[in-house]
């Protein structure tokens, strides 16, 4: 409820295997989900009461799908696979069901038959380019690529590639509303990077790198998610195992970041977070099975539990 912030469960689909990430179609009448431990993607109709009705499930062949999104025309569903190291473009039918795979784009590994493990598929604000972060994980290369999208065929063409340091492992990125400033977090390196993006050429230019944990932290930590607040003034990053959130103010003229603080997430292993339509920040803690609501102060950049 947006009135009192309370959550009410209305349905539980108990037969679904590890529905690890979901997205709406552009009408928000359909939902698509990847099944993280398998090679499956499912479609659902969203009914008037908010419950889901399963439409179909397809096997794309790529193992461990981790992210899913829909193109601007609502014609294709894009899926990133971690162990498969491949982006899959799937035809979206008018009834919301998933059709055939019409295009693929694979990140090669260090040896023949090996891949770089893709962890995200992020559109620019106009949905003309896709940014896909990949972790090296021994057999591949840690990287982020900019890919030009063919709206008719669903195919991708690389326009630029950023290679990270060995073991830093790029995980997720987020695009600023101005479509020029791109921010990416590196999982093992515990860093957040700032890039300038040129939508005319599809090129990325790395300009800044900051830590996502305080310098006093000596233990293990994994950066997991990066988001921009609704005002477009701040970048936020969640850190697993140190169980914290890092906040950075964005310079409105240059896009450079300045840290405003590190905040406890009040749970264990914050794997994902997002902002609601009410401006609240919701942090999902994987190992404590909790979602914690925070108020985000746009004046100070502070996260305050509600």
PLM regions: where:
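Short loop/turn segments immediately following beta-strands, especially the blade-tip
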Residues: 2-5, 44-50, 89-99, 146-155, ...
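Asp-box/WD-like beta-propeller blade repeats and closely related beta-sheet repeat scaffolds
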Residues: 53-124
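A short beta-strand motif characteristic of beta-propeller blades
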Residues: 8-14, 53-59, 102-111, 157-163, ...
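Residue-level detector of Asp-centered blade-edge/turn motifs that repeat once per structural unit
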Residues: 25-28, 70-74, 124-127, 177-179, ...
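Beta-rich catalytic cores
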Residues: 18-20, 64, 117, 169, ...
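Short loop/turn segments immediately following the C-termini of beta-strands
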Residues: 36, 82-83, 92, 135-137, ...
């Amino acid at each position: 409820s947006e009135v009192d912030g309370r959550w009410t469960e209305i349905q539980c689909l108990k037969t679904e295997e590890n529905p690890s990430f979901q997205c709406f179609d552009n009408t928000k009448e359909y939902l698509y989900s990847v099944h993280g431990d398998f090679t499956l993607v499912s479609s659902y109709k969203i009914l008037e009461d908010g419950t889901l009705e399963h439409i179909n499930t397809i096997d794309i062949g790529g193992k461990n799908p981790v992210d899913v999104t829909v193109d601007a025309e609502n014609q294709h569903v894009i899926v990133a696979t971690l162990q498969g190291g491949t982006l899959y473009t799937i035809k979206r039918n008018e009834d919301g069901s998933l059709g055939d795979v019409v295009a693929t784009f694979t990140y090669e590994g260090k040896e023949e038959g090996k891949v770089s493990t893709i962890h995200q598929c992020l559109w620019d604000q106009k949905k003309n380019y896709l940014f896909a972060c990949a972790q090296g994980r021994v057999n591949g290369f840690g990287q982020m690529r900019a890919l030009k999208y063919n709206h008719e065929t669903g195919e991708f063409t690389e326009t630029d590639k950023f290679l990270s340091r060995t073991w830093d492992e790029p995980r997720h990125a987020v695009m600023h509303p101005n479509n020029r400033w791109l921010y990416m977090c590196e999982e093992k390196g515990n860093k957040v990077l700032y890039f300038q993006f040129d939508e005319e050429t599809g090129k990325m230019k790395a300009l800044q790198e900051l830590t996502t944990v305080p310098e006093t932290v000596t233990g293990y930590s994994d950066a997991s998610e990066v988001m921009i607040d609704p005002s477009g003034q701040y970048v936020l990053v969640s850190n697993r195992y140190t169980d914290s959130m890092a906040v950075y103010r964005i310079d409105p003229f240059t896009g450079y970041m300045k840290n405003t603080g590190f905040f406890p997430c009040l749970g264990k292993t914050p794997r994902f977070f997002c902002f609601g339509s009410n401006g609240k920040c919701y942090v999902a803690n994987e190992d404590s099975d909790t979602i914690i609501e925070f108020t985000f102060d746009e004046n100070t950049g502070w996260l305050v539990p509600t």
